[in-house]
Structures are given as C-alpha cells and as structure tokens.
C-alpha cells in the first residue's frame, strides 16, 4: 500500500501537523511512528482551538483511522485529556472506533515525570519522555502489551516498584513508588484504553 511520509528537518515547529491535516483527506490512515507529548499541533475548528500533543492531526478527518505507533512513548493521562477535549467539541469518541494504540508503544508513568523533573542540566520539558525512552533502550520499560501480564505477576510488580523507587532516590527524590501506586496506574490504563490497544503493524 503506498504511503506518504512527513518528516521534520531537525528541531520541530516546521508545520508537519498542518501538512498532515491537509493531506489526511486523501488517506485512510494517519500514523505517528515515534515521539511523545513534547510535540504539539494546533487544530482550529470554528471558534475553538485544540492543542494536541499525541493524537495525529488527521483527527478532524472523519474517515481517517489514527495510529499511535510502535516507536512512541505515550502518556495515557495526557491522551485522555486530548480525547476528552475532542469529545466535548464533537461528541465523538475515536478511541472506541478509529484510534489504535500500538501494543509495542511504551507507557509514560508518573515515575518518569518525577525523574525527569530533576534534570536541570539538559533543560527537558519535564514530561518524562527521556526517561521513558531510556527504559525502552534498557529493556525495562513497560509497553502497552505488557500491562496485563505485569498485573498478574506480583513478583514483577514488586521488582518494578523497587527499581523505580531506587532510581528516584539516586537523584535525590524521597518519593516511593509502591506496588499499590503502580497497580492503580496500570489498571486504570488498561481499563481506559483496552478497546484501543492493538497489534498495529499488520494494519
């Protein structure tokens, strides 16, 4: 199947979202393949302006399916805010019909945001994107496909919560990530987005 790929030159703010918005009526799918919610594009519908950070800008095209792809690090809480804003404007719930989250995409958890907030040297956005990609590279990050299995494995839950707490202590933070914290977050993600999580590669 032929595809059109829109790539940025280097630093962002090049108008990729606008280009995709104009191209999407010609296509059945809009796929974002990497990145996190440090990105952003603005959608203006009538007198209403929406700021999107994760959902592809093909969103206003009704026939266009939307994919958050394998290479993304996704903050589920930010995603919910974007979806709620769209529902309030249009009455549509794309996550129930045409929004698909790759099961291989990585999850940004509150731990990642906390850890990121301590980095004053690089000057990050503090949204947990760097730490989430670090966990992905080190093969200790949680993908959407992993959530159900982790919830059914008390040993894994304990190991993950201890690792996160240890990493926070190493950068001078006293917050503890308990098993209960982790379980609550993962159960909410699974309950909220189970209809959208899918093996998006074959699509």
Name these PLM-found stretches.
Residues 1-203:
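Non-transmembrane, aqueous-exposed alpha-helical and coiled segments at domain scale
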């Amino acid at each position: 199947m032929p595809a059109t790929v829109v790539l940025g030159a280097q630093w962002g703010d090049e108008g990729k979202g606008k280009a995709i918005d104009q191209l999407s009526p010609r296509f059945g799918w809009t796929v974002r393949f990497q990145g996190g919610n440090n990105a952003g594009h603005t959608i203006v519908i009538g007198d209403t302006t929406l700021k999107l950070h994760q959902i592809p800008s093909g969103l206003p095209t009704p026939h266009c399916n939307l994919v958050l792809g394998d290479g993304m690090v996704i903050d589920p809480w930010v995603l919910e805010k974007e979806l709620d804003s769209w529902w309030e404007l249009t009455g549509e719930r794309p996550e129930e019909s045409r929004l698909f989250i790759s099961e291989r995409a990585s999850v940004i958890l509150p731990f990642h945001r906390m850890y990121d907030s301590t980095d004053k040297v690089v000057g990050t956005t503090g949204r947990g994107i760097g730490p989430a990609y670090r966990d992905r590279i080190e093969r200790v990050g949680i993908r959407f496909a992993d959530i159900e299995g982790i919830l059914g494995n008390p040993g894994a839950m304990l190991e993950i919560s201890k690792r996160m707490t240890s990493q926070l202590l190493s950068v001078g933070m006293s917050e503890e990530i308990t098993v209960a914290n982790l379980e609550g977050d993962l159960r909410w993600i699974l309950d909220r987005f189970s209809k959208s999580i899918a093996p998006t590669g074959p699509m």
